[in-house]
């Protein structure tokens, strides 16, 4: 009698860039991509995995880029936080459409739209079987959504953080530009930091390293890859302390 495989991780945080929701578009959201990702989150939810999500806003707005063109950085970052909220609401709607209970929480107060991020309440939502989408980054300028994801992963006591990218892991150099790029199966946060491998910004890496938070970097453009990763298959690159 065959036994049904069980997920390796009980509670996870999925970090997606805003660009992951664009598909082949140059801007905005591709509903087909959003719906596919939502369905994969549904499968994880039905397998008993507690899922927290952090989504960037780069498909709609990048505060750092406008700051380079003269806009005050704080203003640009606040606008970027609102872009993450827009993406979070899109994912919330896609999940609700397929019957997944979900709560969007925000580091900025927008009470008419969603509840504020309160750590204990967010953990309780996860324990009750709700997917939790954390919007607006850390609520502070000068911090990336990678930093926000690392912070939330640590605060919510997840078993591992999963970073969705457009390549199937971390390489010695950009595999889209260099044919001799070699993929890492696993590596330490210190090596990622020392070799400047572009996994995440330094703040994010140090937070994960110091709090022994495992990170799995995988290719979100491959259908079902997040499910395989959470179930412990040999997917992507594992980064560890």
Swiss-Prot record:
Documented EC number(s): 2.7.4.22
Keywords: ATP-binding, Cytoplasm, Kinase, Nucleotide-binding, Pyrimidine biosynthesis, Transferase
Location within or outside the cell: Cytoplasm
Superkingdom to which the source organism belongs: Bacteria
Entry-linked Pfam families: AA_kinase
GO biological process: one example: 'de novo' CTP biosynthetic process
Substrates-to-products reaction catalysed: UMP + ATP = UDP + ADP
Main location: cytoplasm
InterPro entries from the UniProt entry: AceGlu_kinase-like_sf (IPR036393), Asp/Glu/Uridylate_kinase (IPR001048), Uridylate_kinase (IPR011817), Uridylate_kinase_bac (IPR015963)
Annotated metabolic or biological route of this protein: Pyrimidine metabolism; CTP biosynthesis via de novo pathway; UDP from UMP (UMPK route): step 1/1
Protein family according to the UniProt entry: Belongs to the UMP kinase family.
Protein name stated in the entry: Uridylate kinase
Species of origin: Dichelobacter nodosus (strain VCS1703A)
Gene: pyrH
């Amino acid at each position: 009698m065959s036994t049904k495989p069980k997920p390796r991780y009980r509670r996870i945080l999925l970090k997606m860039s805003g660009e992951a929701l664009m598909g082949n578009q140059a801007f905005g959201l591709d509903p087909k991509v959003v719906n596919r990702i939502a369905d994969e989150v549904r499968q994880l939810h039905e397998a008993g995995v507690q899922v927290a999500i952090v989504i960037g806003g780069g498909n709609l707005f990048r505060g750092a880029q406008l700051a380079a063109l003269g806009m005050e950085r704080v203003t640009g970052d606040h606008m970027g936080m609102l872009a993450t909220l827009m993406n979070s609401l899109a994912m919330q709607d896609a999940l609700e459409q397929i019957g997944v209970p979900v709560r969007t929480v925000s580091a900025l107060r927008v009470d008419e739209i969603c509840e504020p991020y309160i750590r204990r309440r967010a953990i309780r939502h996860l324990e009750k079987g709700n997917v939790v989408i954390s919007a607006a980054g850390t609520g502070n300028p000068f911090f990336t959504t990678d930093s926000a994801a690392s912070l939330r992963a640590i605060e919510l006591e997840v078993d591992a953080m999963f970073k969705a990218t457009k390549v199937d892991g971390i390489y010695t150099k950009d595999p889209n530009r260099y044919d001799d790029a070699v993929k890492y199966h696993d590596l330490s946060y210190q090596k990622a930091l020392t070799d400047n491998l572009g996994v995440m910004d330094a703040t994010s890496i140090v937070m994960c390293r110091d709090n022994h938070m495992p990170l799995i970097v995988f290719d979100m453009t491959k259908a079902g890859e997040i499910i395989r990763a959470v179930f412990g298959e040999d997917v992507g690159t594992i980064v560890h302390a």
